[in-house]
From Swiss-Prot:
This is DNA-directed RNA polymerase subunit beta'. InterPro entries: DNA-dir_RpoC_beta_prime (IPR045867), RNA_pol_asu (IPR000722), RNA_pol_N (IPR006592), RNA_pol_Rpb1_1 (IPR007080), RNA_pol_Rpb1_3_sf (IPR042102), RNA_pol_Rpb1_clamp_domain (IPR044893), RNApol_RpoC1 (IPR034678). HAMAP family: RNApol_bact_RpoC1. Mg(2+) binds at D489, D491, D493. It holds the Pfam family RNA_pol_Rpb1_1. Its cofactor is Mg(2+); Zn(2+). It comes from Manihot esculenta (Cassava). Zn(2+) binds at C69, C71, C87, C90. Binds 1 Mg(2+) ion per subunit. Binds 1 Zn(2+) ion per subunit. Its EC number is 2.7.7.6.
Length: 680
C-alpha cells in the first residue's frame, strides 16, 4: 500500500469476501472467471506441469516461464496493452513469471469458518464484541451445541418436541436422525443455528455505535457505585470495567477502519501466491514442498467432501454434515495457526507442520528476518567488550572481521602497489596473512569509518560511526561512555558492524554519526555520554580509599593487609606508618614499584590555601622533632611548623586512586582550554 506521501506501507487487517475475490479473479476472453482453487493437486506426476484449478494452476497464478503458456506457446511480453493477452487453448495469461509472487487465489468454503486469530487469541475479539464467554463460543463454533432461532407465531419442530433448552446436547443425537441432508439443512436454517454461521449472524446483527453507548453507560454506573467493601466483588467490578473499556476501544477501531465485524468469519479463504510456498526439486529427483501446501490440500479435501455431502448425497444424516463442518473448521485453524487448539498436526516423520502463523511470526518469521532484518553485504557481528584505552570516537575491530569487511580495498591496494598481479594472487596473499596485508589494511582503515548498530534500534543513537583500529581476539572493543546511547552492557551483548561504501554515506558518518558528535540525548537534551555501570564501579574502587580513617589506622592495627611492609617493627601494638611524598610523581612511582597499593593512605605535599585551615579544629596528634619543628596531624591534612610556629609545608591525606583521577581530570581541563585558545 502507498499513502498520499508515496510512502510504502503494510497494513494487516480483516478484508471483505468481495476484496478477496477481487484479488484473485481474472476474466478470460471467453467470459470465464478464474481464481478459485477447487482441486487439492499440485503437479502432474508424469508431465511435472501444474494441475488445472490446483494449488499451482497457471491459469490462476500466472505462467511458470515468462511469456510461455501451459500449451508451450511463446509470446513476446510488451509494455503496451494489447487486446489478446491470454492463450485461447489453455487460458494462461502472457505475462512475466514474477506475477506468481503476488497473484493470489481463493477457496470458496462450503460453510462459514471463524478466523482462529480473532477467536482463540487473547483477548478474543469475537468474545469481546458479543460479550459472551470464550468457552461458550468455542462450543458453538465446533458444533458441540446450538441455540434456537426466535420464530414468533409459527409452529416449529422444536415446539412440538417441547422446550429446547440452551446448551443441551440432546438435539445432537436425536434431531438429526429424523432428517436427510436437505431436510436437515432446511430445518437448521429455519429453527436452529450452529457453527461459524451462527457467529457470523450475531456479528452481522451488531450495531457498533449502540455497543459503544451501552458500554459507556454501564461503565459509568459501575464507577458511581463505588467500593462495596468485599474484595472479591470489587475485583469482579474492576475486571468488568476493564472489559468494557476494551470493548469500546475495539468497536471504535472497527468504525474508524471501516471493517465489518462479520469479516472475522471467513466465507472465502485466500490462497497464497505459489512462489511464497514453493515446491523445489532436490538431488535424486525428490521434491521438497512447503508445509503450507499440505495444509491447503487438507482444507480442500475436507471442503470438497462437505460440498459433496450438501449437493450430491440426499440420504446423508444431518449429524454427519455437522461433523464434516467441524473438520473443515479444524483444517482452516491448522492452516492459520497449527497447535492453537492443543495438539499440533504432524507429518509422517512426527514433525510439526509450519502454519501461516509460524511463517510470519517470531525472530525467524517473514517480517523480522526478511523485511526488517535483512542480511546485507559488508557487515559482521560479534560480542562487545570494554576498551578502556580507546578514544571516544574509536572502536576495536578483530583482525578476522576487519580483513573480511575491507577485503576489496586491500585487494585494490595490493594491485596498485604492484604487490599482486591480479585478484586471485591478492586473495592468496590475504589467505596466507602476509605482513604487507596488515600494513595495507591499517592504511585503509585509517580513512574509512564504520557503523556500529545494536538491535533493537529504538532511537537515533542506536547506530553510530567510529574510526576502527585493529585489535587482537574475536570481540569488538567499545568505549564504555557510548554504552548508554546503545543501551548496551558488557555481559554478552552483540553488535553489528557495517561499512559505508558511497561517498555520501561516508560523509554522513563523519559529519553526523560519529560518537563524539552525539554527546547529548536527541530526546531530552541531557548528556548521554556519561559514566555508567562498569565505569561507576571503577571510579568507586579507584577513590574509595581506606574506610578505617586515620584514628582507626593508628589505634586499631588488626587489619594490616596493605601495610605489612610499612610497619615500624613486628609489634602489633604499633600503628602502620603512612608514607610522605613531595609530589604526585613520586607517589605514582611507588605504586608502580608495588611499594604501596591503590587504596593505601599516604601524605602528599600540597599547595593549600592557609585560610582553609584557620579553623578551631584541634589536631589529633602533635609530633615534635629535635630541631624544634613539629607536625600537627589532623584528620585530612598535616601541617609542618617551625619553632616560630610558622607553616613550612602542608600535606594532605589521600590515596593513589585519588591522585590518578585528579591528574586525568586536570589533563582533560588543560586540553579543553588549549583547544579553546587555539580556536578549535
Amino acid at each position: 500500500m502507498i499513502d498520499r506521501y508515496k510512502h510504502q506501507q503494510l497494513r494487516i487487517g480483516s478484508v471483505s469476501p468481495q476484496q478477496i475475490s477481487a484479488w484473485a479473479n481474472k476474466i478470460l476472453p471467453n467470459g470465464e472467471i478464474v481464481g478459485e482453487v477447487t482441486k487439492p493437486y499440485t503437479f502432474h506426476y508424469k508431465t511435472n506441469k501444474p494441475e488445472k484449478d490446483g494449488l499451482f494452476c497457471e491459469r490462476i497464478f500466472g505462467p511458470i516461464k515468462s511469456g510461455i503458456c501451459a500449451c508451450g506457446n511463446y509470446r513476446v511480453i510488451r509494455n503496451e496493452k494489447e487486446d489478446q493477452k491470454f492463450c485461447e487453448q489453455c487460458g494462461v495469461e502472457f505475462v512475466d513469471s514474477r506475477i506468481r509472487r503476488y497473484q493470489m487465489g481463493y477457496i470458496k468454503l462450503a460453510c462459514p469458518v471463524t478466523h482462529v486469530w480473532y477467536l482463540k487469541r487473547l483477548p478474543s475479539y469475537i468474545a469481546n464484541l458479543l460479550d459472551k464467554p470464550l468457552k461458550e463460543l468455542e462450543g458453538l463454533v465446533y458444533c458441540d451445541f446450538s441455540f434456537a432461532r426466535p420464530i414468533a407465531k409459527k409452529p416449529t419442530f422444536l415446539r412440538l418436541r417441547g422446550s429446547f433448552e440452551y446448551e443441551i446436547q440432546s438435539w445432537k443425537y436425536s434431531i438429526p436422525l429424523f432428517f436427510t441432508t436437505q431436510c436437515f439443512d432446511t430445518f437448521r436454517n429455519r429453527e436452529i443455528s450452529t457453527g461459524a454461521g451462527a457467529i457470523r449472524e450475531q456479528l452481522a446483527d451488531l450495531d457498533l455505535r449502540i455497543i459503544i453507548d451501552y458500554s459507556s453507560v454501564e461503565w459509568k454506573e459501575l464507577g458511581e457505585e463505588g467500593p462495596t467493601g468485599n474484595e472479591w466483588e470489587d475485583r469482579k467490578v474492576g475486571r468488568r470495567k476493564d472489559f468494557l473499556v476494551r470493548r469500546v476501544e475495539l468497536a471504535k477501531h472497527f468504525i474508524r477502519t471501516n471493517i465489518e465485524p462479520e469479516w472475522m468469519v471467513l466465507c472465502l479463504l485466500p490462497v497464497l501466491p505459489p512462489e511464497l510456498r514453493p515446491i523445489i526439486q532436490i538431488d535424486g529427483g525428490k521434491l521438497m514442498s512447503s508445509d503450507i501446501n499440505e495444509l491447503y490440500r487438507r482444507v480442500i479435501y475436507r471442503n470438497n467432501t462437505l460440498i459433496d455431502l450438501l449437493t450430491t448425497s440426499r440420504s446423508t444424516p444431518g449429524e454427519l454434515v455437522m461433523c464434516q463442518e467441524k473438520l473443515v473448521q479444524e483444517a482452516v485453524d491448522t492452516l492459520l495457526d497449527n497447535g492453537i487448539r492443543g495438539q499440533p498436526m504432524r507429518d509422517g516423520h512426527n514433525k510439526v507442520y509450519k502454519s501461516f502463523s509460524d511463517v510470519i511470526e517470531g525472530k525467524e518469521g517473514r517480517f523480522r528476518e526478511t523485511m526488517l532484518g535483512k542480511r546485507v553485504d559488508y557487515s559482521g557481528r560479534s560480542v562487545i567488550v570494554v576498551g578502556p584505552s580507546l578514544s571516544l570516537h574509536r572502536c576495536g575491530l578483530p583482525r578476522e572481521i576487519a580483513i573480511e569487511l575491507f577485503q576489496i580495498f586491500v585487494i585494490r591496494g595490493l594491485i596498485r602497489q604492484h604487490l599482486a598481479s591480479n585478484i586471485g594472487v591478492a586473495k592468496s596473499k590475504i589467505r596466507e596473512k602476509e605482513p604487507i596485508v596488515w600494513e595495507i589494511l591499517h592504511e585503509v582503515m585509517q580513512g574509512h569509518p564504520v557503523l556500529l548498530n545494536r538491535a533493537p534500534t529504538l532511537h537515533r543513537l542506536g547506530i553510530q560511526a567510529f574510526q576502527p583500529i585493529l585489535v587482537e581476539g574475536r570481540a569488538i572493543c567499545l568505549h564504555p561512555l557510548v554504552c548508554k546511547g546503545f543501551n548496551a552492557d558488557f555481559d554478552g551483548d552483540q553488535m553489528a558492524v557495517h561499512v559505508p561504501l558511497s561517498l555520501e554515506a561516508q560523509a554522513e558518518a563523519r559529519l553526523l554519526m560519529f560518537s563524539h558528535m552525539n554527546l547529548l540525548s536527541p530526546a531530552i537534551g541531557d548528556p548521554i555520554s556519561v559514566p555508567t555501570q562498569d565505569m561507576l564501579i571503577g571510579l568507586y574502587v579507584l577513590t574509595s580509599g581506606n574506610r578505617r580513617g586515620i584514628c582507626a589506622n593508628r589505634y586499631n592495627p588488626c587489619n594490616r593487609r596493605n601495610y605489612q611492609n610499612k610497619r615500624i617493627d613486628g609489634n602489633n601494638d604499633k600503628y602502620t606508618k603512612e608514607p610522605l611524598f613531595s609530589n604526585s610523581y613520586d607517589a605514582l612511582g611507588a605504586y608502580r614499584q608495588k611499594r604501596i597499593h591503590l587504596d593505601s593512605p599516604l601524605w602528599l605535599r600540597w599547595q593549600l590555601d592557609q585560610r582553609a585551615i584557620t579553623s578551631r579544629e584541634a589536631p589529633i596528634e602533635v609530633h615534635y622533632e629535635s630541631l624544634g619543628t613539629y607536625h600537627e596531624i589532623y584528620e585530612h591534612y598535616l601541617i609542618v611548623r617551625n619553632i616560630k610556629k610558622e607553616i613550612l609545608c602542608i600535606y594532605i591525606r589521600t590515596t593513589v586512586g585519588h591522585i590518578s583521577l585528579y591528574r586525568e581530570i586536570e589533563e582533560a581541563i588543560q586540553g579543553f582550554c588549549q583547544a579553546c585558545s587555539d580556536g578549535i
